[in-house]
Amino acid sequence: MDVNPTLLFLKVPAQNAISTTFPYTGDPPYSHGTGTGYTMDTVNRTHQYSEKGRWTTNTETGAPQLNPIDGPLPEDNEPSGYAQTDCVLEAMAFLEESHPGIFENSCLETMEVVQQTRVDKLTQGRQTYDWTLNRNQPAATALANTIEVFRSNGLTANESGRLIDFLKDVMESMDKEEMEITTHFQRKRRVRDNMTKKMVTQRTIGKKKQRLNKRSYLIRALTLNTMTKDAERGKLKRRAIATPGMQIRGFVYFVETLARSICEKLEQSGLPVGGNEKKAKLANVVRKMMTNSQDTELSFTITGDNTKWNENQNPRMFLAMITYITRNQPEWFRNVLSIAPIMFSNKMARLGKGYMFESKSMKLRTQIPAEMLASIDLKYFNDSTRKKIEKIRPLLIDGTASLSPGMMMGMFNMLSTVLGVSILNLGQKRYTKTTYWWDGLQSSDDFALIVNAPNHEGIQAGVDRFYRTCKLLGINMSKKKSYINRTGTFEFTSFFYRYGFVANFSMELPSFGVSGINESADMSIGVTVIKNNMINNDLGPATAQMALQLFIKDYRYTYRCHRGDTQIQTRRSFEIKKLWEQTRSKAGLLVSDGGPNLYNIRNLHIPEVCLKWELMDEDYQGRLCNPLNPFVSHKEIESVNNAVMMPAHGPAKNMEYDAVATTHSWIPKRNRSILNTSQRGILEDEQMYQKCCNLFEKFFPSSSYRRPVGISSMVEAMVSRARIDARIDFESGRIKKEEFAEIMKICSTIEELRRQK
């Protein structure tokens, strides 16, 4: 039977059908190949928006830099980055006037954070540019490498373990005439295999010392590595995102802490809150505008879009903002906060892997690394690429492009939100001094603007004034992509408002289904997603029940664990049937062991093991939850685990789910192929860290200890702890005299070895 899809919508109010137009089903698009082209686009575009600025040359690195600040006022509607310092400062002053004490209080809060933050804050985060190896690494490894290099170059303030002291080392490192680093490299050689007598390539990993002069080190310290942003839906073209190195990260963290503290106190800020809290905040602003627009007044809302927000922002403006916000604060604090924008004014963008060429006739492929783009003959490239390279050449130094204007994606979300809110704040009648007034919401580059006025001319005048004010601060509202409606219908950060927020359910679609972590976690996450959507996203009981049945079906197909009494044949069905027949209480079997599903929409909050515990056979309980079972790598499982959910837009969300450690909570082993690459040295380092930490936690099982800092104290702490524990055990008769003597001997040997080293 053919169903006419329009029939589905006969009973649905139009605004609820919005979610069906979102591109969120199916797999999102991923990028392949290099991001070099996208990065060059970003660099060239950013310079084009600021082209009427002043060119200077960085005295330390020799990089050409473009400064658009206080540049010509725009005469057309083209996007531009010519922010006016005095306007930004005035906007800040008015923001403070409407919120007395806001900057002062946020500075005090931030100062406290600065003094308490430990350096391991920087281990959070995924890929980070590792300047010692000149490529991306997991954050923890990149930090460890940086600290190792700092220490071998005589920079030791970081040993206190405070982030602020690590940053002192960063500052000192920039004054050094040279830095010595250790790099990993591969040697390949052809050798004959004794068994097969064939020639094989043997790879060995070496480490070599390398000296960087001041200029090379500064370039690396100021480099942002670039990648292509993956899994972006609803876009035809990919775009580049940046990941900064460890030198910049700590400074950015403190600036964002200050800005976050300010945003929390601003009613128009959509950050740092999210979810229902954000919806409540937004609804408040709308309510205020609707109740204050008397019967005589019109109220309109713009669903706003800004053109290339990041590329028109400027770190120099952020420096001006910070200088103003911290004006009455101690010198050291002002200095710490001003370093991030200064580093960003001198940043370099690494162009990525370069280009891949292939010759169809000769079956050859060759990689042109980014470093060669400055000198290579352009006849090999197509027109568009040739234009890009020609444009970017004057900016190139060692495979990186000088990029002074613009902020790369996602670096100063909070601070740029403060800038946006400062314009919304200017819409109060006491500032507009006329009949129109405005208010709105700002979340990074996304905004909604509500304008009230006695008539349509007033609304138009208000929008125009807002538009021009934005231009003065380097913000470009897109006239093509923004649209205006009577207040009551608008969209903001993918929340659709229609006399209240409409659930945009399609955005949650990607999180339904089996996550693929392991049988235990997947069951738990699957039901938690359904539960959360019933709470937050208007998922009704009937639909939820259906979602649950589909999930169980999906789960059984994924793990081939169909019920023990089913006819479906899979690789596991022989084992599962055997278990089914031996089990007295079949309802007690987990779904992943071929048991029935006992979940319904009322008990989604209970972990499956708990739900079925009373129904299980005793020997099944014993096997399922046996910590001595050799097949389980039991991590110490906390009662609440975190899964990283990728919602359809915005950052990955942490989702909590209940976890019960069973034989189904396995952790897959690492892929072997990494062991043959130059990453192997890094992997060994990581395992060494892991082993040391595990050993340390064996000695100090309580989680209440403060981590000791510096390598010496760890060993000493473990030795002294071993001696104390051994004495207690010996005196209470838990160990024999010989064992006690042996432990003491081992402790002395360890200390002796440390002294010799």
From Swiss-Prot:
Post-translational modification: Phosphorylated by host PRKCA.
UniProt-annotated stretches for the region Disordered: 53-82
MF term (GO), any: RNA binding
Biased composition (Polar residues): 55-64
Pfam families for this protein: Flu_PB1 (PF00602)
Keywords of this entry: Eukaryotic host gene expression shutoff by virus, Eukaryotic host transcription shutoff by virus, Host cytoplasm, Host gene expression shutoff by virus, Host nucleus, Host-virus interaction, Inhibition of host RNA polymerase II by virus, Nucleotide-binding, Nucleotidyltransferase, Phosphoprotein, RNA-directed RNA polymerase, Transferase, Viral RNA replication, Viral transcription
Motif annotated as Nuclear localization signal, chain positions: 187-195, 203-216
Spans annotated as Promoter-binding site: 249-256
Catalytic activity, reaction form: RNA(n) + a ribonucleoside 5'-triphosphate = RNA(n+1) + diphosphate
Nucleotide-binding in keyword set: yes
Enzyme class: transferase
InterPro entries, alphabetized: RNA-dir_pol_NSvirus, RNA_pol_PB1_influenza
EC numbers on record: 2.7.7.48
UniProt subcellular location: Host nucleus; Host cytoplasm
Annotated family: Belongs to the influenza viruses polymerase PB1 family.
Subunit annotation: Influenza RNA polymerase is composed of three subunits: PB1, PB2 and PA. Interacts (via N-terminus) with PA (via C-terminus). Interacts (via C-terminus) with PB2 (via N-terminus); this interaction is essential for transcription initiation. Interacts (via C-terminus) with human PKP2 (via N-terminus); the interaction competitively inhibits the interaction between the RNA polymerase subunits PB1 and PB2.
Other known facts: South Carolina isolate has been sequenced from formalid fixed-lung tissues of a 21-year-old male which died in 1918 at Ft. Jackson, SC. Brevig Mission isolate has been sequenced from lung tissues of an Inuit woman buried in the permafrost in a gravesite near Brevig Mission, Alaska. This sample was recovered by John Hultin, retired pathologist.
UniProt name for this protein: RNA-directed RNA polymerase catalytic subunit
Source organism (scientific name): Influenza A virus (strain A/Brevig Mission/1/1918 H1N1) (Influenza A virus (strain A/South Carolina/1/1918 H1N1))
Name of the gene encoding the protein in the UniProt record: PB1
